[in-house]
Amino acid sequence: GSLIGTSHGIFVSSDGYAVSRWKPFVGASKAVVVDAQGKKYDVDALISANDIYDVCKFHVAGNTPTAPVASNTIPEKSTLWLSCYSVRAPRLLRSTVSKVESFSVTGSGESGTSYPFYILDIQVPEDIDCCPLIDDAGNAVALIQPVSGKTGTANAVSVKFVSDMQSVMLGQGANTLALSAIPPLMPSDYNDAQIALVLAGQQRSPEYYASVVESFIRSFPQKTDGYETRARLRLASGDVAGADADMTKAIA
C-alpha cells in the first residue's frame, strides 16, 4: 500500500499505549510508529478516537519508552516547551500560555471529565502537528494542533484527555474507529466481544469488519465464533481452502 499520512505523538505508558493525531489513521490498514531513536513499532490496535479534536489513542506491540502526563491544568502566562521531533535534530521551542479554556466530551470512550484546551503565543513551524508541549518538570501537557500559515498563535489539546480515553466498540465511537481498517482493541469480556463482532459486520467497510474478525480470533483463540465468521468471509471471496481450514479449527 501507499503512505496516506504522517503525524507525531507520544507514548503514555511503558506497555505500548500512545496518543496522536487521528486523521492519518483514517483509511489506513496499517500504521508504524518510529520513536526518537529510530526504533519502529507496529500499531496492533486502536483504542478510541475523537474526530472533533482530531486525536486518538492506540496500542503498539512491545515495551515502549513513556512520557509522564501532567495531571494538573497549566495556568495562563506559564511557559510550555514545544518538543519538535526529529531523529537527527530534535529541538525545543518556548511558548507562553495566553489563554486556557475547558471542555468536556461525554460519549463512547470518554468520561465527561473537564479538560484544558490551551491557546499559545508561539510561532509554530510546519509539520509539527501533535508534537507535545511539556512543562518545566518534563511532563507532557498538551498536543499541538495543526496551524495554517504564520499566525503567531497555536492551539493545543490536553494530553490527559487523550490518555484517559477508554476502549470503545459500540455507538458513535465505533463508527469513528470504523473509518480505519486497523483493528480496534477487543473487549476483554467474551460476551461484549461477541456483540462487537456482530455489530462490526454492520459497518460500511468490509476491511474494518475483517480486521475486527482477526482481532477477535487473537483475543479468543479457543472460541469458535471468530473462525466461523472468517470462514464465511473467505468462502465469499472464493478462498475455499482457507474457509475449510477455519471450519476445521472451529469444530476441532
Regions found by a protein language model. Give the residues of each.
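Alpha-solenoid helical repeat scaffolds
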Residues: E228-T229
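C-terminal cap/linker of serine protease catalytic domains
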Residues: A142-Y208
